[in-house]
Amino acid sequence: MSAPNIDSQELAKWDPDLTARLIDAAGPVAKRWFRSQVRGLESFPAGGGALVVSNHSGGMLTPDVLLFAAAFYRKFGYDRPLYTLGHDALFVGPLSEWAGRIGLIRANREVAARALRTGGVVLVFPGGVYDSYRPTFTQNVVDFSGRTGYVRTAIEADAPIVPAVSIGGQESQLFLTRGTSLAKRLGLKRLRSDILPLTLGFPFGLSVIVPANLPLPTKIVTQALEPIDIAARFGDNPDIGDVDTYIRSVMQTALDRLARQRRFPVLG
């Protein structure tokens, strides 16, 4: 079977009715618990494909996905699909079918580019779990761990990049360390993991991924920034590194601004 057909089948799994039911059920709960605010959607492209590039927070829970999706669908409705790139572990066993139906697709450049070309909006967290488990004491640092594939995806699909930043998710518990050195010693790279994070939270206290602690009701604010047309800003043959540096710089400036507005940990 050809790759385009595989890509099409993966995108075709999206079920707007199921997605709406999930968002309607879980969205208000998450919004109240995290006192969520999503800003800047008024400048979001009104139609067509767009690649939303965001920092990732909250460890295993990563509430930023649900919070952004709920705000996105409130504004644009369910005629416009929002796909989120996910780790391969989400597509194993019975989870695979459910993942596709609510818009999760594999973190694969070809699949993402096809979604963008068909007019879908794609949400990507280039830093992945490396970012979502960053220490709380460095929570306001945009760190993609050198990953630049998102830039190539946007260029291949001729889609604008919409940078987005969120703050507060790393206060849902105390993220102590990614545990990269320990993961290396234990040879976890064979299992496609470069980290073995240590966190402190409620009710289990210290946790190494499991048992999963409950998230504190930290206030999470997400800011969508102005869309960036890569060709218009960087020309027809942009340097991937230059684009990545610029995107992260724009995001870091916005995250610094949100950090200055935040008065207290957890409370916001």
Model-derived segments and their meaning:
Residues 36-39, 71, 109-110, 209:
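A generic local structural motif
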